[in-house]
Amino acid sequence: MSTLLTRRHFVAGAGLAAAAVSTRAWSVEGGFDVVIIGAGLAGMNAAMLLSELGANVVVLESEPRPGGRCRTMDEWYLAPDLGGAQIGRDYARVLDTAAKLAVKLGPGAHINAPYSFVLDDTLIAAQDWESSPLNRTIGEERAIAPHTLGGHYVEARTPFTAIDGWLQPEAANYDLSLAQWLARQGASAAAQQIIRASIGRPLETLSVLRMMQEATRSRIGLAKIDAELLKGKDQYERAGITSQHVVGGTSRLTDAMAATLGERLRTGERVTTIDMDARGCTVRCAGGRRYRAQYVLAALPFSVLRRIDIRPGLRGAQAEAVRGMPYGNQSQVWLRLREPYWEKDGLDASMWTNGAFNLIRQQIEFDGSRELISALAFSDNAVRLDAMPHAERGRFAIAEIERIRPATSGVLEFVGAHSWLQVEGARGCSYQMTPGRAFDWTHAMGKPHERLWFAGEHLRQLEVGMEAAMESGERAGRGIAELLMN
């Protein structure tokens, strides 16, 4: 944004625009400057920025609550976060917003207990993995834990040294599938099978360029941390060591952001159509309400955006990305522990498996308490789990864990179940990229289309996770602000 765009100048400009509203046919249903669709971190960050500059903004959220995939289950035992639990030390926008809104942060974030491994229903101690006859990997792979094999072949070998490396022209050379990359790196067939089981998706469908972006950002962020402290840990465990957490759960942050917007945030408003012409935009909602604005910002996952009728329609690589971007699912079953079962069998508490649950994570809170397990099913496993009622998912998870780990018998209690695919405002968890199209999509899909702008974690450029969402909201908000002043 230009340094000339001060709050005083913006408000003055907005006043002139408002004066013109009464004489313009496009001023219908309120004459907003911007309609923002989606009240996650990206949408609310953009709304706060634009509101501070004097813009007349309304935020429409289809769900009954703001926050997007940041959600603290306050009604569950110990109120776990279902997403957005870790605030990295480099999350400048998140940290600044928390400070500005007096949202209390605490040191550390939950981490997962070290892993044992369950391969073909056989429980293997971590120290026995390298010599196990079930470990069919070869060479140096044998010493690498199953849940960190992907990191060994991608994170440790990303060619990028700068956080914007994946945006440079030469990055197109790495627009490959994970299967292609692993073959180039000489990964054994057994290693590829393990990585496939860890992710839950065919390796041919996964973009290694997208994975390299995360890997590079993580590597740069962790460069000053003792390597021994990070050894043998997956990306989430490593992040937990250096992260902070929101006291009371991450929803306290998104609730505070929503509170600053007040009546400008409207929940239960599912957008069905975005109509644009030379004079402005009309946004129509399922309940019949219409909103008129100069610009629209769609801060939605593409899994949701592609269900909205956009006129005129998107074109080229941008249309292709919105229409075809794959989204994974993470179906979660949360359990309470009555006893420390790991003391019975002497094995590490968390489990990687190639069975019904990809990861069974025993959660160690920032204060050292250990009372929760999250059993996570990805992709095809998640589809099967999601077909069950919530209580049945709990019974299934307990029975499965007791079967593969007898020491857990009688010590687990169902807390709750959640699937991001079954949330209409999310329709999936993490976004993916189609191999061979990731580079083009990355450079096309975030560009404005007519009067429609875009934001969301999937439009990351330099950051990851919560900070990527905030980054994209800020970028779109500033771009729209510039236009409002012209």
What are these regions, as identified by a protein language model?
Residues 298-314:
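Flavin (primarily FAD) binding-site architecture
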Residues 52-72:
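Glycine-rich FAD pyrophosphate-binding loop
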Residues 34-58:
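N-terminal Rossmann-like FAD-binding beta1-loop-alpha1 element of flavoenzymes
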Residues 13-15, 53, 128, 280-282, ...:
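Conserved flavin/dinucleotide-binding core of flavoenzymes
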Residues 161-269, 278-280, 299, 433-434:
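Active-site/ligand-binding neighborhood in enzyme catalytic cores
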Residues 1-17:
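N-terminal secretory signal peptides and thylakoid transit peptides that target proteins
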Residues 275-290:
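Conserved beta-strand-loop-beta-strand element in the redox core of flavoprotein oxidoreductases
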Residues 37, 291-303:
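Short hydrophobic core segments
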